[in-house]
Amino acid sequence: MQEVRILLLALSLLMTTTSSVHAKESETTNETSPSKASAKQAKSAHAPHASSQDGAAIYARYCALCHGDDRQGYAADDAPSLRSPQLIGSAPGSYLWTAISYGRPNTPMAAFQDTLGGPLSHDAQHALMDWLIKESGVKRTPVKDEPVVGDATLGTKVYEQHCAECHGAEGEGGTGTALAHPVFLATASDAFIRHTIANGRDGTPMTAFAERLSEPEINNVVAFLRSRATGWKESTPTLAPPPDPANAVLNPSAAPAKLDEREGRFVSAKSVAAAMERGERMVLLDARPMSDWQRSHLPGALPMPFYDGVKELVPHLPNDGTPIIAYCACPHAASGHVVDALIKEGFTSARILDEGVLIWAGLGYPIALGADPSLNQ
């Protein structure tokens, strides 16, 4: 597990462009102005918008796979609970909005805003947020944005003792949130972070520390986390059109890829990379939201978001033993969903990339970056 965390941290550092924004500026970044999508982008770069009328249906289609049918969290890859009263009750609206819109780049949490290639329109995001707030049953009283004064050096020691086990030695995340992530630090105010440390989140592994740590100790942890900020700004990138599914098969005239399998369901990154190097025949499907494909993907991979269903792609896929390899960042939830759907359609050669795309990239295997450099900030 430690090796995996190191690889994820290395990938995050590699693909996150350091902004000129000073960490101090991040302290006051507590409101985000939602932007509306370009109709041209929405039509050409991803699937049609979700309906804005039914937040429950939006959640079930796009969120439940990882966050759980009842918002309980931890259904896949430690995705957090979305029904915690402390989260819904205290988080600024801009924090919730940005988390849905921009996700957490280089983690399993993708961007869902349509201007980034995601499936949700401006109105659909509002419907989802309104539904999450309503279902929580709590009265929202977002904490006031008051800067916290603390000692980052002293906070380092407190963090190492009480936080690193879940959140990672460098804040890269683990079973807990990636607290050093640029988007998190740019959108979570000092007061919100302090409130979360003190009060915890019911129904999650995040316990309250108000009775275990003094107020200065909590403030010092906040100062330590704030010192990790590198700056982040929202942007609206240029999106590339998805590739033609008629070209789904890579190296169509070559022999089928020879892959190392596990349990008849998973194939190793090492064997897939070797087959790519040998120029063998295969199909690669990116099961993440289109926004992640726009950011980076395995060379030649087709976007096949887990929430879209496989029916439209089926006519373009070979059913002659050619390996069809789906991947995601979870590393198995979204890709497994797609593979299960393909197997039901009779594609028995469908497999899951065992390590997922983040570990794939961390191991130095080929990655195609998106057309717009701002996507890699």
Task: Spell out what each predicted region is.
Residues 24-25, 76-77, 81-132, 174, ...:
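Extracytoplasmic electron-transfer domains, predominantly the class I c-type cytochrome c fold
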